[in-house]
Amino acid sequence: MRSTIVATFAAGLVVASLVAAHGIVTDIEIDGEWYTSSLVFEDPYKIPIPERISWSFFGSGNSPVADFTTRDIVCNGNASAAALVAEVDAGAEITFYWDTWPESHKGPVMTYLANCGSDCRTVDPGALFYFKIDHAGLEDGEWISDQIIANNLSYTITIPEDIAPGNYLIRHELLALHLASDELGAQFYPMCANLRISGSGIINPTGVQFPGAYKMDDPGILVNIYNDIDTYTIPGPPPYNSDSEFSDDDFESVAEISAASVSVFNSSDFIASTLTKSYSALASVYTKPSTSDFKLKKSFSLSSVSVPDGSSDNFDCNVNG
């Protein structure tokens, strides 16, 4: 009887310690400016409740989202919209600081952006489309979660320089895989914050929706990390890469191009070549879907071309979608 009580007590201590060790983001540094994140164990008891840039999930505490097929996977359980918005320039760095993270909770980190339209404070986060801007997992036998612990419980990402300005929801999460060998054993720790991104970019990458982006049998979600694995597939789409405009063959335009002016030499072959190479200059919006083919979604035709005599002149053309 005594041994049963001792065993039960020990198991309770293990569970309690694991619950206490679950982490949340407590601070966010945005281009050198600090913001306190929503504090699930403090803010609900303050009068008035502090306004934050991060969405609150007071009812969930620091517990993980186990069932990623529910709306809880978007911004955590019973998430409520944040009242404030942080201003940030495209190309700036954002650092997320966690309060704690147990060494046993090995796994990847992932960060997404979603364009909210007019206002992130009134949007339904489950209706948005999220494009990944950063992720890290297992590299050279070391999990990124261990690096986060070693780096003062912090992780830094960079806002892509070429994305279009606007209101964005940033979604940041750690995924713990210590129980991921069982279905729904993977533990997600997502959070969201409101951003207003400034810049001169024109890119609107395609995205995925939550729930829906992750599947039960994804190799990065249903996985036994104790099998001495050498490689690990991070869940979700690949991160958007600003540098891959001409190196990757997977851009697809959704822009409607009405007119353009291109400087060319007096050569019909050069005109055709320049129109092809100058496609990026003509389009106002790009998206980057998960396809291996470079496609122009909007077909276009030259309605008029006038090239005066001379070695180098301008011509005007109308590009019709």
Curated annotation (Swiss-Prot):
Its EC top class is oxidoreductase
Which key words are in the record?
Carbohydrate metabolism, Cellulose degradation, Copper, Disulfide bond, Glycoprotein, Metal-binding, Monooxygenase, Oxidoreductase, Polysaccharide degradation, Secreted, Signal
Specify the domain of life of the species encoding this protein: Eukaryota
Q: What does this protein do?
A: Lytic polysaccharide monooxygenase (LPMO) that depolymerizes crystalline and amorphous polysaccharides via the oxidation of scissile alpha- or beta-(1-4)-glycosidic bonds, yielding C1 or C4 oxidation products. Catalysis by LPMOs requires the reduction of the active-site copper from Cu(II) to Cu(I) by a reducing agent and H(2)O(2) or O(2) as a cosubstrate.
Q: Does the keyword Metal-binding apply?
A: yes
Instruction: Give the principal location in a single coarse category.
Output: secreted
UniProt protein name? AA9 family lytic polysaccharide monooxygenase D
Q: Which family does it belong to?
A: Belongs to the polysaccharide monooxygenase AA9 family.
Question: Which positions are tagged coiled coil?
Answer: none
Q: What is an example of a GO molecular function annotated in this UniProt entry?
A: monooxygenase activity
The UniProt entry, under Pfam families, shows: AA9
Which is one Gene Ontology cellular component term of this protein? extracellular region
**Reaction(s) the record says it catalyses:** [(1->4)-beta-D-glucosyl]n+m + reduced acceptor + O2 = 4-dehydro-beta-D-glucosyl-[(1->4)-beta-D-glucosyl]n-1 + [(1->4)-beta-D-glucosyl]m + acceptor + H2O
Cofactor(s) listed in the protein's UniProt record: Cu(2+)
Q: Which residues form the signal peptide?
A: 1-21
Q: What is the lineage of its organism?
A: Eukaryota, Fungi, Dikarya, Ascomycota, Saccharomycotina
Q: How is it used?
A: Lignocellulose is the most abundant polymeric composite on Earth and is a recalcitrant but promising renewable substrate for industrial biotechnology applications. Together with cellobiose dehydrogenases (CDHs) an enzymatic system capable of oxidative cellulose cleavage is formed, which increases the efficiency of cellulases and put LPMOs at focus of biofuel research.
User: Binding of O2: at which residues?
Assistant: H178, Q187
Classification via InterPro entries: AA9, AA9_LPMO
Q: What is its EC number?
A: 1.14.99.56
This entry's comment on the bound cofactor is:
Binds 1 copper ion per subunit.
Which compartment or compartments is the protein found in? Secreted
User: Which cystines does this chain contain?
Assistant: C75-C192, C116-C120
Q: Where does Cu(2+) bind?
A: H22, H105, Y189
Native source species: Geotrichum candidum
